[in-house]
């Protein structure tokens, strides 16, 4: 039993040492179009309305992670968008599977999940309304990686994300109750950047 346990530990240690881990950091530009919708209800006067729209913005995206055995890439990324008085911060955990085309060129496909935070001050006929909401964001991405040098890599990709982010604000104005709901739906993104592999 002791020899079996020792052999198992030795095999585990050998496997861990054999794992090729290559840390990296990256920076790039991401262009995102975010779709959202909302509704307004004033029950006291029988009024209700709904709307949908989209905002587009370009943001600096930062990421850090590691490539495991030249095949699996894990990373954390952060981006902040600002448009029409709204701030959107997105923090993601990303996984990519790499498909080598040749020694310098890889394609990848993967998934991401994390948190999105949305803040906006809206001026309305009843005064300023503060929208502050956060929740889950998740989705899929595809892209390509090209080695410029041994350590410097060019990356370009596309991503699609869904959001579980909404907020409902209720109040009373001139004795009349109202309710305002805002909800993030989905987004599409295009990214290009540079990674440094250690």
Where are these regions (language model features)?
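A mature extracytoplasmic/lumenal domain signature
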Residues: 6, 78-80, 158
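Flexible, solvent-exposed loop segments that connect beta-strands
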Residues: 33-54, 74-91, 115-134, 164-185
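Transmembrane beta-strand segments of Gram-negative outer membrane beta-barrel proteins
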Residues: 19-33
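Gram-negative (and chloroplast) outer-membrane scaffold detector with strong preference
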Residues: 60-125, 129-138, 146-148, 188-198
């Amino acid at each position: 039993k002791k020899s079996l346990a020792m052999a198992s530990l030795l095999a585990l240690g050998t496997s861990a040492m054999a794992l090729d881990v290559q840390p990296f950091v990256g920076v790039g530009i991401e262009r995102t179009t975010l779709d959202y919708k909302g509704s307004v209800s004033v029950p006291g006067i029988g009024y209700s309305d709904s709307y949908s729209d989209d905002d587009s913005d370009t943001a600096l995206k930062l990421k850090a992670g590691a490539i495991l055995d030249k095949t699996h890439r894990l990373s954390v990324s952060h981006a902040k968008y600002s448009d029409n008085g709204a701030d959107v911060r997105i923090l993601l955990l990303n996984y990519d599977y790499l498909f080598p085309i040749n020694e310098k060129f890889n394609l990848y496909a993967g998934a991401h999940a994390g948190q999105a935070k949305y803040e906006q001050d809206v001026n309305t006929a009843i005064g300023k309304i503060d929208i502050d909401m956060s929740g889950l964001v998740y989705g899929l991405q595809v892209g390509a990686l090209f080695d410029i040098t041994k350590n410097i890599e060019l990356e370009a990709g596309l991503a699609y994300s869904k959001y579980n982010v909404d907020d409902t604000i209720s109040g009373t104005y001139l004795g009349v109750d109202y309710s305002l709901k805002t909800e993030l739906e989905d987004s599409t993104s295009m990214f290009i950047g540079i990674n440094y592999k250690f």
